[in-house]
Amino acid sequence: PIPRMGGLAIFFGFILSALIFVPLSTPVRGMLLGGVIIVILGIFDDIYALPALPKFFVQIAAALVAVLMGNQIDILSNPNIFSSEPYWVLGIWSIPISVLWIVGITNAVNLIDGLDGLACGVSTISSMTMLVIALTVAEPEVALLMAALSGGCIGFLPYNLNPAKIFM
């Protein structure tokens, strides 16, 4: 059998880099704490094969921690070329949409983890893309977090490619 919990290797590399190099502002602490909750959930799920509903509620709680500590989507750009409004200000919808987004991304990555290297490869591409965007718009904290995440994924990827020696 192939060992599981390889995500711990990514997470430990990520969290260590984040704690050393990233200033621990309230939003960063929220992201890290939400991530710790998700990692603990993943450990329990790997060991006990938890039912979907309790996992979903824990994911919502983890997302709420991150969102309520300042990580929320306040404005969306409007792709409708026929609208005079280039942006949508979310107002009171900011928190539920942000939670929905985080839970959705969490589950999307979990769902694509069925093929060797797929989730890790997609996460590497995504985090490197966000790294470049963060550098472009002068968001150094986000850039450092994305550098740490992409580094963890790149370090794990050779062990997760077909034939996988460990699963995320």
Question: Where on the chain are the PLM-derived regions?
Answer:
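"…together with the soluble PPM/PP2C metallo-phosphatase catalytic core" -> "…together
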Residues: P1-M168
